[in-house]
Amino acid sequence: MTEKPEIWTIRKVLDWTRGYLAEKGVENARLETEWLLSAALGLDRVGLYVNFDKPLNPEELAACRGLVARRAKREPLQYILGTQEFCGLDFVVTPSVLIPRHDTEVIVEEALRRAPHAAAVLDIGVGSGCIAVALAKQLPHAQVVGVEQSPGAIALAQRNAERHGARVTLFEGSLFEPLGDQRFDLIVSNPPYIPTADLEALQPEVREYEPRAALDGGSDGLDFYRLIVPAAPEYLNPGGWLMVELGIGQAETVLGMFSRTGFCDCFTAQDPNGIDRVVGGRIG
């Protein structure tokens, strides 16, 4: 007699995948399993449980295996699914850009709180476009400009701007280089801020998959602040704000840069974990 082929129901695949990903060191293995299987099967997460006992056909199993194998190699879930939510908007993400973090929403919140009438906004290092697009959606009458060195990131930011109907003008280049004599009421930036020596200790998802150029901030993580902060006043209108995201333990040093450059009303803002995540100041 020939043995009957093993039947894999959604319940069985969920249980097996959850354990497998946990063994591979994936945090939140249960939740990520649900997202992966939802994507593979074209169901929402409720649909998985409604169809708990549904047997999967070979094509469905192959689709599940393909996504699970990628995650088991610690490829970020966001790259596998192709999107990440930020400020209530879904952004397309690829390995050409840093994955938007919820901590970065703090800089958007502070910008809207402190510069709600900004008519000209600049995002330095636009990446996926998440900050620029989020601000453009909340400041529909503002001229929002983004600068980015990576051609791949520029293309993706343009795609995300179009996806959300946001008016964002993008320039390829380094920092302030492409801007000529333009001036702004608000400049924001989430520059690379991880010290080079710390990169190897990052989680595999970050170390192996996200673009190193978007992470590496030089020997002490502060290289880009030394370039951005002193140059920013030349590109700010009177009363204009500069706000930057930063890493753990960097706020005091960056605040010093702001003060020495002549910024006033300097502040720090914390992320949901109580970590100083944004430093900002205003040109008088």
Swiss-Prot record:
This is Release factor glutamine methyltransferase. It holds the Pfam family PrmC_N. S-adenosyl-L-methionine binds at G125, V126, G127, S128, G129, E148, N190. One of its GO terms (molecular function) is protein-(glutamine-N5) methyltransferase activity. NCBIfam families: hemK_fam, RF_mod_PrmC. It is an enzyme of class 2 (transferase). It catalyses: L-glutaminyl-[peptide chain release factor] + S-adenosyl-L-methionine = N(5)-methyl-L-glutaminyl-[peptide chain release factor] + S-adenosyl-L-homocysteine + H(+). The keyword Transferase applies. Gene3D superfamilies: DNA helicase RuvA subunit, C-terminal domain, Vaccinia Virus protein VP39. Its EC number is 2.1.1.297. GO terms for biological process: methylation; translational termination. Coiled coil: none annotated. InterPro entries: DNA_methylase_N6_adenine_CS, HemK-like, N5-glutamine_MTase, PrmC_N, RF_methyltr_PrmC, SAM-dependent_MTases_sf, Small_mtfrase_dom. SUPFAM superfamilies: S-adenosyl-L-methionine-dependent methyltransferases. Keywords: Methyltransferase, S-adenosyl-L-methionine, Transferase. Substrate binds at N190, P191, P192, Y193. Signal peptide: none annotated. Methylates the class 1 translation termination release factors RF1/PrfA and RF2/PrfB on the glutamine residue of the universally conserved GGQ motif.
